[in-house]
Amino acid sequence: MKPAIPMLAAVFALASAATAQRPVRVFILAGQSNMEGHGFVSADAKRNGGKGSLEYLTKDPATAKQYAKFLDKTGQWRKRQDVWISYLDRHGPLTAGYGVQPDMIGPELGFGWVLGDAFKEPVLLIKCAWGGKSLGVDFRPPSAGKPPYSLGKNEDAAIAQDPGIIGEYYRETVSRVKAALADIKDLVPGSDGRYVLSGFFWHQGWNDRINQQFTDEYQSNMADFIRDMRKDLNAPKLPFVIAETGMGGMEETNPRALALMKAQADVAEEPEFRGNVAFVGTRAFWRPKEDSPLDQIYHWNTNAETYVEIGEASAEAMKRLLRMK
């Protein structure tokens, strides 16, 4: 019976090699601070008794079963061997800790977990996110041109001296995505370099919803962003998911905030985008400060549950765009 052991090992090795040689499914994640991710991982008693942290969610009887998937058999954070992430200067298997700091998460955790379970192919997430960036200026797509209004005396002077400020992070996103695709063999162990650019996940909007001019042109800027990004990545039908900037939840009443959220939803309803762009409402994922680590409305109160739910819902929307069950 002993010879069967090496034979069995060989079978598993061949199966593993076959899996690794499948084209990698690549998804781009982009936005500002809430795509970076400010959801706390560790349950610090000094932060509201740890409520709303990922660790707390794995221990709270009300959520422990649902969040057990993020833990391995030893109780440590599970590292997926079929989903990988590249986020600025960090990369590796998807696990808790790929937020703006190593003890934080963003939407990438829930997003990658759902898609990793959905695909037989390995998955790579390329996350390009920077805090405090607007679509009106920083991510402004080429087709939108220069803002047709003054940004203020100092800002106008800075742009006159350096026009590259306009759209800087749009171009940086394109550059980083292309660099990651070129390095895919290093980013995804076992990859032969083949990939399928499968989707783009956008979560951004705070810096636009606090500026009336940015809010007024958000829908047109977002539409140009989608068109330009598809062109620059040579992916004319690339599915896009827009996760609402729903901080404040269902009780939000600020007219500009509501207008910005409506603009995000309306993009997906434009005739050319129906069936290839999806809007994901996020206001229901809001958790009050009483259930969260910190009182920071602009960062979803740093609640890990919120970030996981945004990611999961956006992945489900992506699956629908990709015609997956």
Predicted regions and their residues:
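Cell-envelope and extracellular/periplasmic
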Residues: 21-325
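Hydrophobic residues in alpha-helical membrane-spanning segments
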Residues: 4-7, 31
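Positively charged n-region of N-terminal signal peptides that target proteins for export
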Residues: 1-4, 115
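Bacterial N-terminal signal peptides
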Residues: 6-15
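Sec/Tat signal peptide C-region and signal peptidase I cleavage site
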Residues: 16-20
